Amino acid sequence: MTPTWVNAPGRMVMATLSVPDISTAEGLYSDCLRYARVEAGRIEEPLARSWGAPAMAGKAYVLMAPREADTYALRLVETAPVADFAPMRTFGWGALELSVESVEAVHEAVKDTAFRIIGPPRDIMFGAPVRPMQVSGPAREVFFLTQVLEPEEGPETARAFVDQLFIAILATPDRGKALEFYERALGFKRGATFDMAYRSLNQAFGLAPDTQQSFTMLGSPVEGVIQVDQYPTGATARPLAPGHLPPAIGMVSFVVASLDAVRGEFFAAPARFGQAPYGGRRAAALKGAAGEWIELVEAR
């Protein structure tokens, strides 16, 4: 049964991670993030075709979620690694932000593991006081693990050791073009723009730690869900194996009220899929302005 939370238009359903060894990745997320398996199997050919990634057919997948929740957060899909791919250096989905109960406890859980800490915990003001840290995983996927210090009711409020995905960070060569795409195709609304010393991004590009970088928030009908980063000079298109999803953060899935209202070109015509998280609902995928893969699932 598909949880009610996943049915709300504008919500992020989950992110799909392309990982070279699914057993290793699942064990790491279970041990360090305390995520649990919801469902496992192999990608069926019609679903792979809907992603514009026919080579993904037959690949093993695992759907994972916080142990204390009945919703989804991550779908791991096993793929061959792509050479010459470095985290936070290419366009597309650059990072995922997950809410945590205690960033210090998470820091203890991930240190000296296959996660690489690229930014230790620190306090910042981002609308409200938060304490984030940043890590990269064995597939070179990047997570921002964020504790909200004055929590209110909302998707960023953690109710588990590591809880839900609440912001997807998009790396772009042209932020304005990316913002226009989501406004036109999905009806998302442009939010505030921020300039800040972006520690993890500056580190990836060898820039001084206090170098100012700029990003803009995008809001869906129900919440702010995408952070659109303008990437520095030197960023490149993400390398892609033919017929596969992009490496690391391969795709992010959102709920929409109707696929018929989407103003974009799908890889394949919308189709119904029975496995979680679709539950018989229609889904389709398309490519965004920065080369990112976007999956859309109808609310009903």
Predicted regions and their residues:
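Vicinal oxygen chelate
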Residues: M1-A8, M14-L17, A40-G41, Y72-V77, ...
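Eukaryotic phosphotyrosine signaling hubs
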Residues: M12, G92-A95, L165-F166, P247-I249
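Core segments of cupin and vicinal oxygen chelate
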Residues: L17-D70, D123-F126, A171-E223
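Extended intrinsically disordered, low-complexity coil regions enriched in Ser, Thr, Gly, Ala
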Residues: S23-I43, D84-W93, A105-R116, G176-M196, ...
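A short, acidic/glycine-rich surface segment
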Residues: E45-S50, P81-F85, P151-P155, R199-Q203, ...
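Short glycine-biased active-site loop of nucleotidyltransferases that positions the nucleotide triphosphate
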Residues: G52-M56, A86-M88, Q134, A158-R159, ...
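Post-signal peptide N-terminal segment of secreted/secretory-pathway proteins
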Residues: P54-A55, Y61-L63, L74, V82-T90, ...
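Glycine/small-residue-rich hydrophobic helix-like segments
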Residues: M217-G219, Y231-G234, P239-L240, L245
